[in-house]
Amino acid sequence: MPMMERPAVRDCDGGRCWEHEFPTFLMKVFVPDNDLDGQTNNYGFRAPLLLVFEEEKQDLDSAVSFAKETGLSKIAATYDSSVLFIYPTAEGGWESVDSSLYADVIKEIKMITVYKDGIVEDYNFFTKTFEGFFARGAKFRTDIYSYGKSADYVANNLLKTLEGEYLWGPGEITPAMCSMENLSVVPDVKRKDIAILSVGNSDELNLAFSGCENILFKEKADYVNDYNSFVKKFKMWCGHIELEPDFEALGMTEDVGFVTVKTSPDNEFLPAPADEHKVGYFAYYNNGLFDNGPVPLVIGFHGGGDSSMYLTYVAGWWDVCRKNNFLYVAIENHQFVTATEARDVIEVLKTRYPIDEKRIYATGFSMGSGKTWDLYQEYPEILAGIMPCSALFPVYTTFFGKPVTDRLNKTVSVPVFYSGGYKSHLPELPFQGESCVERVKYVAGVNKLKKSFDDVTFENKDSWEDPVWGVSGDRTEESYDPTRDATLTIHYFDSEDGVCRTAFASVSNQIHECRQHSIENAWKFISQFKKD
């Protein structure tokens, strides 16, 4: 059960702390002070979810002291994050619980952009309902630190594929890293890719880790150095261990910045009304990119329940810009940014980087797809192309759910590559929802497609020519993604002038997510276009 009342937060030496007892476990949270402006530039998707499984139950002050003495608080502060302490409520402690306890813990943790004191408020954008308070953390960066009895619990129960409440619904919640110190049982290793930090364990017990793909043996824990050299490399994204990029080694630069914009009249989502506000961003580019003149810009908008680093690190835009030599700028907290303000951000970026004004592109995932569509609707003249994914929002309302302004684009064609997940629990493809049909018909009209969508309605989907889109493309292409055992099926549609500037794609075996394979194909198509 989520917390329906905000837990009492108190100041403590070096930060803030709070605790809450759930039905199956007690959670204590220490939020160390830091110098980051996390509300402007959100580090959440890079931040580790530091879970300390206490061997014996301790009080809150003792937990805070442990975090500081070990250096876990320093790690958390580096990423504007927290240290979470867990102990079972069951009589008998760790010896009385199984993997369902871990699932219970993960269920009470969410990644939402608005947060304070390590707590997020979950307000469902679609149902307009408040769903509770949750501890803040990135489930796919779960790093577990365990000792003695709790280490035995991890060794017996968590070194395998685990299912539970993932980012946007049911999914895999397997931890990225498990640190086990002073084991007394032989680990039951059913999964070899989970990163293992074995501390102070005998050679005999360590034999159980033979064949593990990612392992570090230590006599004694050195938390900060172990994290920087080993732990921080790993994330468990949708059931697959992935490694973080080393930008220095790759010859890349990451810039952190913000733009102060004038608040537009249609901005009703700011937490507090203001005449102007900050818009944070992270920019990524190859060293030396600007040596030969203006460069293409891709501006990215994240999903509603995540931050800019989702598109950058998880979807992989950093790698696509590295391979294709363009400037990628990921906008932070864009849910507080209107299309007008996004346009203003682009204008400022043009003064900070040598941007080719004829090659400005936009992309977005989920609610970020909505922001990308808003730019298509309101400011098409600034765009050479768009690459939205995983959301086909209604046309005749803005991202904020308000009626569109008189700026609604009806005539300016803009190249589009859109992709959505075939197995998503949200409406991403026309066969999944009426609003999706509305969006596709709108694009067909604005981009002046040769093929007509006029007779396509959601009610008659059982008789559609194409079971996903209603109408088949002029050409169809399939691209297999071996990393996810999925196929991207692309329908290319020609416009009346003979130019193919519209691509609608579906991804088999994909839920509500954004994958690098899809965005690489999107860039391959969209990058051929530039404004006249």
Go through the PLM ranges and name each one.
Residues M1-L49, V97-K107, G118-K128, F140-Y147, ...:
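A domain-start/cap signature at the N-terminus of enzymes
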Residues L36-A47, V52-E95, L289-V295, G300-F336, ...:
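Short substrate-entry loop that stabilizes the transition state in hydrolases
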Residues V52-E54, M180, F301, C389, ...:
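Alpha/beta-hydrolase
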Residues S65-S73, N182-V189, M309-W318, V345, ...:
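Alpha-helical scaffolding within the catalytic cores
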Residues Y102-F140, E341-K358:
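Conserved acidic catalytic loop of the alpha/beta-hydrolase fold
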Residues G164-S184, E381-Y396, V414-P415:
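A conserved short beta-strand
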Residues L197-V199, Y418-G420:
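Short beta-strand/loop motif that positions the catalytic acidic residue
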Residues N201-L205, H425-E438, C514-H517:
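Conserved alpha/beta-hydrolase "acid-adjacent" motif
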